[in-house]
UniProtKB/Swiss-Prot annotation:
InterPro entries: Asp/Orn_carbamoyltranf_P-bd, Asp/Orn_carbamoylTrfase, Asp/Orn_carbamoylTrfase_sf, Asp_carbamoyltransf, Asp_carbamoyltransf_Asp/Orn-bd. PROSITE patterns: CARBAMOYLTRANSFERASE. This is Aspartate carbamoyltransferase catalytic subunit. Keywords: Pyrimidine biosynthesis, Transferase. The keyword DNA-binding does not apply. Carbamoyl phosphate binds at R64, T65, R114, H142, Q145, G271, P272. It comes from Nitratidesulfovibrio vulgaris (strain DP4) (Desulfovibrio vulgaris).
Length: 317
C-alpha cells in the first residue's frame, strides 16, 4: 500500500479540492475506505506513520476538525503536537511566517493549519518544506470537510455522482465548507443548488456553476441530498438577518420540507448544529441523517490525507 501510494500521490500539500484530479480524488477516497475499515476494528491503531510527526497549528478556534486530525494522527501512530493561537507567539505579535519557520525547524512531516486569513495555508505551503494541510482558511476553503462529505455521500451513492442533486442551505456567503463542496461535487457531475436569504449569498455567486434559490421549498424539491450549514448567530447581530425566528420559519430543514426531496434523500451538516434554527432535531436524528457518519468519515479521510502526504514521493507538488 505504501509503495503504491508513493508512486501515485504527487502533492506535497492539500490546499483545496480543485488541485486534485478525478483519479487522485478516487485514490484518496479508496485509501480513506481502507482506514475506515481499520477504525471499525477492536484495535484501531496501526504503525503506518510511526516515527512521523504532525503539528496541528490552529490559529482559530476548532473542536471537531482539530480533534479529528489528532485522532487520525494517533491512530496512524504519528506523534501529534497541538498549538493554538492563544498559546503561541502569534498572540505576541510574531508573524505567521516566523511562527511557521520556528515550527518547521522542529522538522515535522506534516503541518495542519487553520487560520482566519484566506490564503494562509498557501502562504505557508510556498515557504515550508514539510507538507501543509489546509484545515480551513477564512471564508476561502475547507478541503478536508468537502472530502469527508464526498466520502459520506459515496458510502450511499457509490460512484454514481453524475446527475445527482445536492442542496446546500444556509450562510453560503461566509462558508468555506460551501465553497469547497461546490468545487468538488460539481467536478463529479453533481447539480448543486444553493439556498439562502439574499444577504447570505456571496457576491458573484451568479458566476458559480450552481443554481441559486431563496425559497427553500423549491431548492429541496427532488434533491438527492441536503446539506445544512450552521448559522452563525453574529450574522443577525450584524444586521444580515432581520430575525432568527423568521430565518427558522423560512430556512429550517423540517420533516415537511424534507418530504419534498427524493424519498431516499440524505441530510448532512458539518457541525456544530443549531437545532431548531437551521435543522429540526427530528431531522438531525432521523435515519436519513449522515451527521454521525460524517464524523466517522472525517477521521478516516484525514488518516488518508496524513498518510498520503507523509509518505509521498519527494519532489511532488
Amino acid at each position: 500500500m505504501q509503495n503504491e501510494t508513493r508512486s501515485l500521490w504527487p502533492h506535497k500539500d492539500l490546499l483545496d479540492v480543485d488541485q486534485l484530479s478525478k483519479d487522485e480524488l478516487l485514490h484518496l477516497l479508496d485509501t480513506a475506505a481502507q482506514f475506515h475499515e481499520i477504525n471499525r476494528r477492536p484495535v484501531k491503531k496501526v504503525p503506518t506513520l510511526k516515527g512521523k510527526s504532525v503539528i496541528l497549528f490552529f490559529a482559530e478556534p476548532s473542536t471537531r476538525t482539530k480533534t479529528s486530525f489528532d485522532v487520525a494522527g494517533k491512530r496512524l501512530s504519528a506523534d501529534t503536537f497541538s498549538l493554538a493561537k492563544s498559546g503561541s507567539s502569534l498572540q505576541k505579535g510574531e508573524s505567521l511566517k516566523d511562527t511557521a519557520l520556528t515550527l518547521e525547524a522542529m522538522n515535522p512531516d506534516v503541518l495542519v493549519i487553520r487560520h482566519s486569513s484566506s490564503g494562509a495555508a498557501r502562504f505557508l505551503a510556498d515557504r515550508l518544506a514539510c507538507g501543509v494541510v489546509n484545515a480551513g482558511d477564512g471564508w476561502h476553503a475547507h478541503p478536508t470537510q468537502a472530502l469527508l462529505d464526498c466520502y459520506s455521500l459515496r458510502q450511499v451513492w457509490g460512484d454514481t455522482f453524475e446527475g445527482r442533486t445536492l442542496c446546500i442551505l444556509g450562510d453560503i456567503a461566509h462558508s468555506r465548507v460551501a465553497r469547497s463542496n461546490v468545487k468538488l461535487l460539481t467536478s463529479l457531475g453533481v447539480r448543486v443548488r444553493l439556498c439562502a436569504p439574499r444577504t447570505l449569498l456571496p457576491a458573484g455567486v451568479g458566476n458559480w456553476p450552481v443554481e441559486v434559490f431563496t425559497d427553500l421549498d423549491a431548492a429541496v424539491r427532488d434533491a438527492d441530498a441536503v446539506m445544512c450549514l450552521r448559522l452563525q448567530l453574529e450574522r443577525q447581530q450584524a444586521g444580515l438577518l432581520p430575525d432568527l425566528r423568521e430565518y427558522s420559519n423560512r430556512y429550517c430543514l423540517t420533516p415537511r420540507r424534507l418530504e419534498l426531496a427524493k424519498p431516499e434523500a440524505r441530510v448532512l451538516h458539518p457541525g456544530p448544529m443549531n437545532r431548531g434554527l437551521e435543522i429540526a432535531s427530528s431531522i438531525a436524528d432521523a435515519p436519513a441523517s449522515l451527521v454521525l457518519d460524517q464524523v466517522a468519515a472525517g477521521v478516516a479521510t484525514r488518516m488518508a490525507i496524513l498518510f498520503l502526504l507523509a509518505t509521498r514521493t519527494d519532489g511532488g507538488r
